[in-house]
């Protein structure tokens, strides 16, 4: 049975919700799924004053354990058109895995959030996907089999490069049903691909 890791960083809980949806989709495909987060780099007193969501139940991941999974789905919010430094810092530490080819042929995908529709969703997805491709991973996005990403009836995230959500400038907008379903769909597709490739 394929093992899938949903690896995320979420300051305010939006990406945490998307991670849970992606994990649910991967489980629907029959994969064994773990949800883990990367360590925060923000001092706790600063995180508290900024009202970060500090009660996230997912355990902290280690770089070494990435090699144990058949698929890794990476979720992180956008910071000025790129992935947040917490995730970049974590992935930067995977040079040893890269050097050994430990992630070659594994399946990967990405999801993100932005404050606005034009806040850099696709650029952030590319920044994640670029890392995964350097690791030798096979990338699975949010294909147009998920037709709801084509809706014009409401503000919604979504891209063929990965599931996304829009948070609003103050973070008050929570992931919509369409956005969560997109993450679930992508998680299922990634797990299905991992099962085909790795059993």
Curated annotation (Swiss-Prot):
Residues that bind FMN: 10-15, 78-80, 113-119, 134
GO molecular function: flavin adenine dinucleotide binding; FMN binding; NAD binding; NADH:ubiquinone reductase (non-electrogenic) activity; NADP binding; NADPH dehydrogenase (quinone) activity
Requisite cofactors: FMN
Binding positions for substrate per the UniProt entry: 98
Substrates-to-products reaction catalysed: a quinone + NADH + H(+) = a quinol + NAD(+); a quinone + NADPH + H(+) = a quinol + NADP(+)
Coiled coil: none
Keywords: Flavoprotein, FMN, NAD, NADP, Nucleotide-binding, Oxidoreductase
Binding site for NAD(+): 12
EC assignment: 1.6.5.2
Cross-referenced InterPro entries: Flavodoxin/NO_synth, Flavoprotein-like_sf, Flavoprotein_WrbA-like, FMN_Rdtase-like_dom, NQO
A GO term from the CC aspect: membrane
Record text on cofactor binding: Binds 1 FMN per monomer.
Residues of the Flavodoxin-like domain: 4-190
Family label: Belongs to the WrbA family.
The protein's name in its UniProt record: NAD(P)H dehydrogenase (quinone)
Species in which this protein is naturally found: Xanthobacter autotrophicus (strain ATCC BAA-1158 / Py2)
